[in-house]
Amino acid sequence: MKTWGSMRSIFMHADGVDWMLMGLGLIGAVGDGFITPILFFITAMLLNDFGSFSFNDETFMQPISKNALAMLYVACASWVICFLEGYCWTRTGERQAAKMRERYLRAVLRQDVGYFDLHVTSTSDIITSVSSDSLVIQDFLSEKLPNILMNASAFVGSYIVGFMLLWRLTIVGFPFIILLLIPGLMYGRALIGISRKIREEYNEAGSIAEQAISSVRTVYAFVSEKKMIEKFSDALQGSVKLGLRQGLAKGIAIGSNGIVYAIWGFLTWYGSRMVMNYGYKGGTVSTVTVCVTFGGTALGQALSNLKYFSEAFVAGERIQKMIKRVPDIDSDNLNGHILETIRGEVEFNNVKCKYPSRPETLIFDDLCLKIPSGKTVALVGGSGSGKSTVISLLQRFYDPNEGDILIDSVSINNMQVKWLRSQMGMVSQEPSLFATSIKENILFGKEDASFDEVVEAAKASNAHNFISQFPHGYQTQVGERGVHMSGGQKQRIAIARALIKSPIILLLDEATSALDLESERVVQEALDNASVGRTTIVIAHRLSTIRNADIICVLHNGCIVETGSHDKLMEIDGKYTSLVRLQQMKNEESCDNTSVGVKEGRVSSLRNDLDYNPRDLAHSMSSSIVTNLSDSIPQDKKPLVPSFKRLMAMNRPEWKHALCGCLSASLGGAVQPIYAYSSGLMISVFFLTNHEQIKENTRIYVLLFFGLALFTFFTSISQQYSFSYMGEYLTKRIREQMLSKILTFEVNWFDEEENSSGAICSRLAKDANVVRSLVGERMSLLVQTISTVMVACTIGLVIAWRFTIVMISVQPVIIVCYYIQRVLLKNMSKKAIIAQDESSKLAAEAVSNIRTITTFSSQERIMKLLERVQEGPRRESARQSWLAGIMLGTTQSLITCTSALNFWYGGKLIADGKMVSKAFFELFLIFKTTGRAIAEAGTMTTDLAKGSNSVDSVFTVLDRRTTIEPENPDGYILEKIKGQITFLNVDFAYPTRPNMVIFNNFSIEIHEGKSTAIVGPSRSGKSTVIGLIERFYDPLQGIVKIDGRDIRSYHLRSLRQHMSLVSQEPTLFAGTIRENIMYGRASNKIDESEIIEAGKTANAHEFITSLSDGYDTYCGDRGVQLSGGQKQRIAIARTILKNPSILLLDEATSALDSQSERVVQDALEHVMVGKTSVVIAHRLSTIQNCDTIAVLDKGKVVESGTHASLLAKGPTGSYFSLVSLQRKVRYV
């Protein structure tokens, strides 16, 4: 019953058309299987005709011609049958897979957020089902199932013919089926287990490579290249060992197929007894022997394909389970109350809540909160106090464990979920955008909005100006997850998306956190206006977003401890007051440096002219540097001619295995024609009249067949193991060298779209795998095939050159037929992969942004996108289905026609006295088997083409010269640096936007041992200063000096050992907290006490020790298991452990709440003592105590001095204007 349920899961997506296609396909597959046994029957009669020839027989050609004509009739029938098989299965496979992907993704988007927290550990889980699972089932339906049916019917048909012709021999041969099945089943089981382990081993190595490449700035800054490559190499060693085991298993399995020769030997011996004792003809005996071995082999292939049944069952059940799952909070459920009018009054009554993924942690304990309609309520509190949980519960991402949440006195549990969410607009702290245009992203908020409404929403969110500056305006593509936009730009698009919805309830979770102060002021005014008449819930660190709130609620340990207006709470002098005083203390003495316009009067022009974030420029301009530099680096522009000779040179350390492998392949290749030649001789023996001669010759050939079986076993093991050894170690060497080389490239190379982390990791995985296949499998097959062809042609030309020439002339037809059939299947697979790749991208994006999709109820919009991306591949697949049917039919019919020609022409030569029957028997089998071997090798042309591209890709990477050499042998290696930094007349523009100059004749002196703050508006070049100091980029003109020496003259990795960087967005690696802190030192020998001290100094020790595993807590992919503030503190601890001479802080405390920021800032100021420090920050707390503050504007330093001296300049000073503007934004 369970098996039937599993089978139903495979076919559950079939409709009436699909069942009709599968019915016709069944007829075709079964018919295809019976074609070969029918041809065997005709061949038996032909061989008997040839064996009974006498020179006086004038009627010899009549039965030959008659049977050859019968073969042509079979050829015509086979075209129709094989067309049905090829077309119907291919078509229904694509149709069912497309419906499966659509239904699965729809079911995924239907699930509640709690499901993703509990059951989806990573996006790849969903991608696997959308891509791999659907592809497994499509491949099963299109290829594996018809193959199973065809082979099963071929087995039945062969034994039917065997019993019809010679039942005694068939019965004797029947038990040998078991011996024919064992090798395939044995290898199949071993291969599945080893292949799974190899994937798991390489996934670990691939994860290390992906981390290194996606976080390349962090890897470079902490000089962790060697550490990453060593980890990568260690991880690869496991897959190498498994690959050798796989090669050995393959050699044993293929060698065990030599049992066919032994079975043939026994059956020919028994068949000789049938000839002598019962008078059976030689053609009948030899054909029945072929039927027995062919039938057993066909059954083995059918059974070996049954593992695909199992894989398809598992994939189908996994998909079916998701499709049938009804979530607890079902957005598709249209039942539920819809309020005719909604005021927006929100009430939390005695709410207790635990997250499904953390049931041991109580977030709310008896929470009571009332939010009047049309009022703005701000939620404040420490990290983990439950602020964001309020919003999640209100949107019904989760349901509380106890208590009720009401809107207008109606429980939200009784409301229709989709309608409920449609009444809310949400802007999150980390905006989620989709890989489509800006306009389409804004329309996610309201699908039927007009373009004018889109523009108005963009204007209201202060996004219209920067959108208009793009060449394509609102049609500008934002890239995957908005990668082409800066943080502030993404946030403003997200705000526009929320405003266009005109929601009754507005939810703002750090909605302005990514904006500079000028943009924040304008956007905050827009949000304030949008809040009028709406119930608004605000979560924010900055006071500017909560001071004007009607009600401020202070959360602590899951309860509201204070509530009231700002003034009322200040009078209470409680927890809120302490938070305000803490922030005021810092705001009164310092100024924001990255976000503010220079003067209030100059703000508008700055906003219009400088509306790009430096990180946006860093991303978008760097690729132009590659373009410009490529003019002077020919190898980057000109594709290499693939050098297979050079590839072989990389395999030189394995030369002994190469020699052994080639010798074994040559000997193995000779086996097939020798076996066919011997079989032909044995057939001619059957037609001898002298029984003693039959016995004597049979004994010789039987011993020869047994010898070939043993010989094949040992040469196959030697061949497969040797070439696997070559392939595995070459693959490991290529991957190591590629990653090592990639981690020397300048940063702007990684900013190229084609050099994304995903693309590079794909190159590491796929290109190296193709090269391994090229060396480990294809070269082995090529050497073996060359040996086969040479031996076959030599034997043929010696025995009967006329017949041999004709046989050779038709071989290309057979080869082309096999080749087209194999290549066509590969092309079909490629089309399927294209469809699933597009679906996978969409699924990955949808799962990554599931909260956004859930918030805006955008499931149908995503499904329309899926329909759009699958439309092209679906049309192409329909065309390919016709081609598959036509070519499969043509292949089978042409092969049958060539057999008819060979029999007819051989008979003609015998009738004319130009060849004897014995020669025909010897040569016919040789070229029949050789043609198939050549065809198998012929399919390598696509593999060779693919291999050529991969070899080209590999050497393009290995031969590329980086423009910023990290291991320059002539570079100055320093033991210690003082830290004096000088920028002298520096010109700089990011490569992707060479016309937008960041620095123009820029000069600044950063004194050793002193702290220097860099402030100024967006795009003034603050972060670029750090990029140039770290030498992520080089200036176009001018010099950057450290300790009086041009930075380009230093040994770069040696220089970076003395610098440390803490970025705005902390990068952690998938490892433990301890391992991430240890990245601060190149050495792996670090005392535990040093790690703990670094954690304490960074204010991280307390939260780390509160975790169940302490410093051994796993951080997750990119630190996903930790909050932003926790990640930042670990990053700071990593920097503290490095103890650098130059400290670079780019928004180092931006992710921390006020209390944590104060402690960490004290720690940083302690660490900064005696070090050259360059500080960039939005918050004033990080620059108020700096020795020097430099104000940048339009790529130049317009003011510098201490905080006090710059304020003393009064209203005419740029810095004074920044301070004034900030105070206005903070306190208005």
From Swiss-Prot:
Keyword Flavoprotein assigned: no
Record-level Gene Ontology MF annotations: ABC-type transporter activity; ATP binding; ATP hydrolysis activity
Gene: ABCB16
Principal location class: membrane
Protein name: ABC transporter B family member 16
Binding residue positions for ATP 2: G1016, P1017, S1018, R1019, S1020, G1021, K1022, S1023
Bilayer-crossing regions: 22-42, 69-89, 145-167, 171-193, 251-271, 283-303, 667-687, 700-720, 781-801, 805-825, 881-901, 920-940
Organism: Arabidopsis thaliana (Mouse-ear cress)
Ranges of residues in domain ABC transmembrane type-1: 22-311, 658-946
Binding site for ATP 1: G381, G382, S383, G384, S385, G386, K387, S388
